[in-house]
Amino acid sequence: MLNQLAIAEVGNPMLGNIIVVSGSFLILMFLLKHFAWGPISDILKKREDKIANDLDSAEKSRINSAKMEQEREQQLLASRSDAADIIKNAKESGELSRQNILKETQEEVARLKSKAQTDIMLERDTALNSVKDDVADLSLQIAAKILNKELSPEMHESLINQYIEGLGSSNETR
């Protein structure tokens, strides 16, 4: 091979250089293809796959983040709604309690008023009965004193008439 190169160089020095450079280039290309091109291609393919995966992962993360933000917003709205419901229920419960307390108080006042009126009526009736008993006792004492005295026929007739008139007026009032 060297002999041929030497012959080619003797005839045309430029042609020999072209052949040597071309041969060297072809050998270099063969070596690069055999030893470097596969690993370089693999590295580039891995890099391409990694970039694609990173882009997919970033897109999934963005979608997941948007979904989580939407869920958080929904939870926040639900929490606000729950809080509003709790406040509404507390107000309604408070109003109901207030109305119940007011109703119970009014019923207690009415019951106490009725009991007081009943007690007053009982006391009045007791007092009237006591007065009637006192009047009856007093009347009996007066009658006993009068009976102990000697009655004249005129007094006797007057007492009988008064008694009859008293019976008549008491029957008329009934």
Swiss-Prot record:
<dbReference type="GO" id="GO:0046961">
    <property type="term" value="F:proton-transporting ATPase activity, rotational mechanism"/>
</dbReference>
<dbReference type="Pfam" id="PF00430">
    <property type="entry name" value="ATP-synt_B"/>
</dbReference>
<comment type="subunit">
    <text>F-type ATPases have 2 components, F(1) - the catalytic core - and F(0) - the membrane proton channel. F(1) has five subunits: alpha(3), beta(3), gamma(1), delta(1), epsilon(1). F(0) has three main subunits: a(1), b(2) and c(10-14). The alpha and beta chains form an alternating ring which encloses part of the gamma chain. F(1) is attached to F(0) by a central stalk formed by the gamma and epsilon chains, while a peripheral stalk is formed by the delta and b chains.</text>
</comment>
<keyword id="KW-1133">Transmembrane helix</keyword>
<keyword id="KW-1003">Cell membrane</keyword>
<dbReference type="InterPro" id="IPR002146">
    <property type="entry name" value="ATP_synth_b/b'su_bac/chlpt"/>
</dbReference>
<dbReference type="GO" id="GO:0005886">
    <property type="term" value="C:plasma membrane"/>
</dbReference>
<keyword id="KW-0138">CF(0)</keyword>
<protein>
    <recommendedName>
        <fullName>ATP synthase subunit b</fullName>
    </recommendedName>
</protein>
<keyword id="KW-0472">Membrane</keyword>
<keyword id="KW-0406">Ion transport</keyword>
<dbReference type="InterPro" id="IPR028987">
    <property type="entry name" value="ATP_synth_B-like_membr_sf"/>
</dbReference>
<keyword id="KW-0812">Transmembrane</keyword>
<dbReference type="InterPro" id="IPR005864">
    <property type="entry name" value="ATP_synth_F0_bsu_bac"/>
</dbReference>
<comment type="similarity">
    <text>Belongs to the ATPase B chain family.</text>
</comment>
<feature type="transmembrane region" description="Helical">
    <location>
        <begin position="18"/>
        <end position="38"/>
    </location>
</feature>
<keyword id="KW-0066">ATP synthesis</keyword>
<comment type="function">
    <text>F(1)F(0) ATP synthase produces ATP from ADP in the presence of a proton or sodium gradient. F-type ATPases consist of two structural domains, F(1) containing the extramembraneous catalytic core and F(0) containing the membrane proton channel, linked together by a central stalk and a peripheral stalk. During catalysis, ATP synthesis in the catalytic domain of F(1) is coupled via a rotary mechanism of the central stalk subunits to proton translocation.</text>
</comment>
<dbReference type="GO" id="GO:0046933">
    <property type="term" value="F:proton-transporting ATP synthase activity, rotational mechanism"/>
</dbReference>
<dbReference type="GO" id="GO:0045259">
    <property type="term" value="C:proton-transporting ATP synthase complex"/>
</dbReference>
<keyword id="KW-0375">Hydrogen ion transport</keyword>
<keyword id="KW-0813">Transport</keyword>
<dbReference type="InterPro" id="IPR050059">
    <property type="entry name" value="ATP_synthase_B_chain"/>
</dbReference>
<comment type="function">
    <text>Component of the F(0) channel, it forms part of the peripheral stalk, linking F(1) to F(0).</text>
</comment>
